A protein has these predicted regions:
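Homeobox/homeodomain signature
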Residues: 3, 17, 22, 58, ...
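Short amphipathic alpha-helical segments, especially helix-boundary/capping motifs
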Residues: 1, 32-34, 59-62, 131-135, ...
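Conserved AdoMet/S-adenosylmethionine-binding subsite of the radical SAM
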Residues: 77-213
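Flexible, acidic/Gly-rich N-terminal and inter-domain linker regions that tether
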Residues: 1-30, 34-38, 190-199, 204-208
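Conserved Radical SAM active-site core
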Residues: 4-11, 23-26, 34-113
Length: 213
């Protein structure tokens, strides 16, 4: 039986991406090869407890919610993450995966909504992006940019404009917490008429940076 190292499981309101606002079970896996400057889950880098797939499916069943988000850290850093995602889909859950743009997402079960967080220059990890991931995203997925400054915004805007074909995935622009004002980002998007969604971290407006919320 495959096992995964898990930092925490909890039910909260999904604060980001397409399922924002829904009661959601979060399964936060341990470990991440990246060190983004704005990371708000550094506590997931180390520690954690080993859990079997069956144990995590029991957690999902007992949560009594239909949305499950597998997050990290970087969940794809654990090979058994792919098995977990498929098992959750097979059990009838609406499943999303929060992942960086640094690891291959092509093997993720197509029933999963992949939320790919492409790293900007000021994240400190922009050189780790696997840009080939953009070519496998579908309308079921989301591409997220967490923006630390006007320069980050312009980088993301130009990357999108330079593509020969528009991305089928939804594109989300999110202000880095405490670094870019949401109102400023909204003004930039409107001024450029960008076909992107403004995203704020709803859970932080509700509960701040409290772990497990």
């Amino acid at each position: 039986m495959s096992r995964l190292k898990v930092t925490e499981t909890f039910v909260s309101i999904q604060g980001e991406a397409d399922a924002v606002g829904w009661p959601t079970l979060f399964i936060r896996l341990t470990g991440c090869p990246l060190r983004c400057v704005y990371c708000d889950t550094q506590y997931s880098f180390y520690g954690g407890e080993w859990r079997t797939l069956d144990e995590l499916l029991v957690v999902a069943r007992e949560s009594s919610v239909r949305h499950v988000c597998v997050a990290g850290g970087e969940p794809l850093a654990q090979k058994a993450c792919l098995e977990l995602l498929t098992a959750l889909c097979d059990s009838g859950y609406s499943v999303s995966l929060e992942t960086s743009g640094a690891l291959d997402v092509a093997r993720v079960d197509p029933r999963v909504s992949r939320v790919v967080d492409l790293k900007t220059p000021e994240s400190g990890e922009g050189k780790r992006n696997m840009l080939a991931n953009l070519d496998v995203l579908t309308s079921h997925d989301q591409l997220k940019f967490v923006l630390c400054s006007r320069a980050d915004y312009e980088w993301a805007r130009d990357l999108l404009r330079e593509r020969a074909e528009p991305l089928p995935a939804q594109v989300l622009f999110s202000p880095a917490w405490g670094q870019v004002e949401p109102r400023d980002l909204a003004d930039w998007i409107l001024a450029d008429r960008l076909p992107v969604r403004l995203q704020v971290q709803l859970h932080k407006y509700l509960w701040g940076s409290e772990p497990g919320r």
